[in-house]
Design a protein with these regions (language model features):
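Catalytic machinery of carbohydrate-active enzymes
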Residues: 1-167
Length: 167
């Protein structure tokens, strides 16, 4: 049994440092193909199937145009936490006024932390959104700003414009 990686699948004559300059998706596609798998959608991933209807939540919070912030991170990765979200929120409100609502959608463990930010905390019946609700909230946002965390990766997969920040 051989572990499949770029190190094990790349021909000896190819330079790994050059290969590593390719995008993650291109490298992943190469690895899958050389392992004998068909790769129809690897270079064009589509995560939109993972979203659910959140119209009721959007009505409750009057969400039309909104900027979604994810100022959270895993407790053991606090180095990734950017400390200036409230400053950013003030800049957004000063520039756009009520044109965009500034919101956040914490996980169940982040609900108390969300109170530290001057953003509307989006919950479903006082509970954190599930992954499909979160995906739809991200998908419908005007822009996203996040620490290097799961929602930032979801935003990339559903094609939402945004910015990922680190400490």
């Amino acid at each position: 049994e051989v572990w499949s990686s770029s190190a094990t699948t790349l021909p000896k004559e190819d330079d790994k440092s050059e290969f590593d300059k390719n995008s993650v998706l291109e490298r992943f596609n190469y690895q899958l193909k050389t392992s004998g798998l068909k790769t129809v959608n690897t270079l064009r991933p589509n995560f939109s199937w993972a979203s659910s209807d959140i119209d009721e939540i959007k009505r409750k919070y009057d969400l039309k145009k909104y900027i979604l912030l994810f100022p959270f991170c895993s407790p053991h990765l606090s180095i990734k936490k950017w400390p200036y979200y409230n400053d950013l929120i003030k800049l957004i409100i000063d520039k756009f006024g009520e044109e965009f609502k500034v919101i956040t959608a914490p996980s169940s463990k982040e609900i108390n932390d969300a109170k530290k930010f001057n953003a509307v905390c989006i919950l479903d019946n006082e509970k954190a959104l599930d992954i499909s609700q979160l995906t739809k909230l991200i998908q419908d946002s005007s822009f996203i700003v996040a620490n290097d965390t799961g929602p930032a990766h979801i935003a990339a997969q559903v094609g939402v414009r945004g910015l990922t920040l680190s400490g």
